[in-house]
Amino acid sequence: MSTDSQCPVTGRANKHAARVGRMNRDWWPNQLNLKILHQHSPLSNPMGGNFNYSEEFKALDLAAVRNDIFELMTNSQDWWPADYGHYGPLFIRMAWHSAGTYRTGDGRGGARSGSQRFAPLNSWPDNANLDKARMLLWPIKQKYGKKISWADLLIFAGNCALESMGFKTFGFGGGREDIWEPGEDIYWGAEDTWLGDKRYSGERLLENPLAAVQMGLIYVNPEGPNGNPDPLAAAKDIRETFARMAMNDEETVALIAGGHTFGKCHGAGAATHVGPEPEGASIIEQGLGWKCSLGTGRGEHTITSGLEGAWTTNPVKWDNGFFDVLFSYDWALAKSPAGAHQWIPTDPAAKGTVPDAHNPAKRHAPMMLTTDLALKLDPIYGPISKRFHEQPDLFADAFARAWFKLTHRDMGPRACYLGPEVPAEDLIWQDPLPARNHELIDDQDIAELKGKIVTSGLSVSQLVSTAWASASTFRSSDRRGGANGARIRLAPQKDWEVNQPAQLKLVLETLEGIQKQFNSAQSGGKRVSIADLIVLGGCAAVELAARNAGHEIIVPFTPGRTDAAQEQTDVVAFAPLEPAADGFRNYLKTRYSVSAEELLVDRAQLLTLSAPEMTVLIGGMRVLDANADRSRHGVFTRRPGTLTNDFFVNLLDMGTTWNATSEAEDVFEGRDRVTGEMKWTGTRVDLIFGSNSLLRAQAEVYGCKDAQEKFVVDFIAAWSKVMNLDRFDIANS
């Protein structure tokens, strides 16, 4: 008889009773994943629904936290001794790697959620031994508790580390709220092995939206592409990867050189001495991983990246030492004790210029990584590095600004920053908005403006699609985009195909005429912005469409948006926000390897929509005739422009049979089951609401005979949510 007890539920002998059998996705791997729409449930959050992190952070004595971190950094612990007696370099790497997962392609990743605490990030090869950094910070977190999140603490500790070693940082903004389970919406790559690189195709074409070169790396391989020690080839990887993380060439050089001014690499021996990562380690390790069997397993015996050595002669002081060393020597390829490719000076005089991190009796030569030499040898990076070497103040300012951008890029506009150390300067990458300098319109003005809009000659379709185009650029991932600023009238958005530039121009000219007429009629300081008027136009159109369906209802509207200028808008930085697909407008720019319905769910997640909200918005946008190209696909109604539940009623009609119009199966014809008469055409995004069992369940709610009023109410609620996603001025007030 087995000594293992049987599970009281399944009756099976199993040491892991919580395990389950095959999941639905095991049987049907192509099943649409709606779970990304319902992440981070309050049920997983121990703080409770009434917890207000921003209020807690505002009550935090940030100076006291800084003092405690300063004290911690030079208080070396026997269980993980500090290199050079200072934990600063370790904390810089921790903060850098927390923020460095950000990518511009979809705005996901970054430091804002504190996700470095969870798998997979806590166990990525590139994050080896950062578990120790977080454990060292635990007494600080424990002391201040709910007043500072892990997400904020990781970044603030990095700032403190820089400051404690003599560097003046640009500032710090708090406000990052912790998540309590890993996010399921971030695609890290298709590889099934650490350091795999299936993400490349053709001649080193990197898959979107990925930025890192290999699975489990934050940026690039420091030994060179796939370990090939070619500095010029490494420069190409660096340029693409850092650009996909929102950094230009100068910012890239400043970040690499600034970061490598501090600390050292760890490769005291072969990787065979290193145990499992935290997620794979024994329960007795209590969250720690990478246990090392070489010598003491720590201090001078530490193995992390496999590379070994320091870049500068004083690794715990801010200076120009990185460039001094880089340009002072010629470099020869060598191998670390772990067998990793790195570079050492050809000049014998370099030996003994670098102190040992733990043994005062030892001295070493400096080393450089293949990626460091790229900063010297690349024809673009080289002159930038030379300029920084010759102008240390310029370098310091560039690094301060680039570090601030790195650690705050995913936080959104300055309105989201908290604390006394937020810089006053508006930075172009923050998508700045002008301050409001006028009195807001009131309810009477709103009613008057609605009347002018709906009698202006613009259709429900035109008004709805324009308002949606303006607001739906919002990405919850990095809080960019949205209707505030009315950037839809500026480059590059005004020229995006999905926004129907010719129609957009007509709508904007009409709304600007109404704006001018209204503003010029005011005797006081009252004004309406075009940003507000675009949204108000959409709201007025939805009200009219509801009225046409027999429902008198007011669509909520809150004025206060301002109008951004072109000079406040970085055209290059906004390019990644252009929709490759927008299922809500039945738009697909081209055919992709990912299905249209998957792209719809992805966009819904970025808009913070639940499955019911996504469903009701699709149904409403179709009957409001808001397709991007004015196509009839999915417009399952005989009365377009009227807010009815016809989309669901007709989609679920068993009197209709559907067939693809081509082998691509992206457009379908719906014909009468008896007569064969053509009734409708639709896309995958339309038909998925009848095909997918979960979405069909949602659609059936709105397709019932008693669902018309619920449909209108729910559509307006979801519409209003999207229109206000970027209204941080409201949320923070």
Curated annotation (Swiss-Prot):
Q: Which CDD domains match?
A: catalase_peroxidase_1 (cd00649), catalase_peroxidase_2 (cd08200)
Q: Which reaction does it catalyse?
A: H2O2 + AH2 = A + 2 H2O; 2 H2O2 = O2 + 2 H2O
Cofactor(s), names only, from the UniProt record: heme b
GO MF annotations in UniProt: catalase activity; heme binding; metal ion binding
* PTM remark: Formation of the three residue Trp-Tyr-Met cross-link is important for the catalase, but not the peroxidase activity of the enzyme.
List of residues binding heme b: 260
Enzyme class, spelled out = oxidoreductase
Q: Name one GO biological process term.
A: cellular response to hydrogen peroxide
What Pfam families does the entry give? peroxidase (PF00141)
**Cofactor binding mode, per the note?**
Binds 1 heme b (iron(II)-protoporphyrin IX) group per dimer.
* Keyword hit for 4Fe-4S: no
Q: Where is this cross-link: Tryptophyl-tyrosyl-methioninium (Tyr-Met) (with W-96)?
A: 219-245
**Which NCBIfam families does this UniProt record tie to the protein?**
cat_per_HPI, PRK15061.1
Q: What does this protein do?
A: Bifunctional enzyme with both catalase and broad-spectrum peroxidase activity.
| Known partners and oligomeric status | Homodimer or homotetramer.
**Can you say what this protein is called?**
Catalase-peroxidase
Q: What species does this protein belong to? A: Geobacter sp. (strain M21)
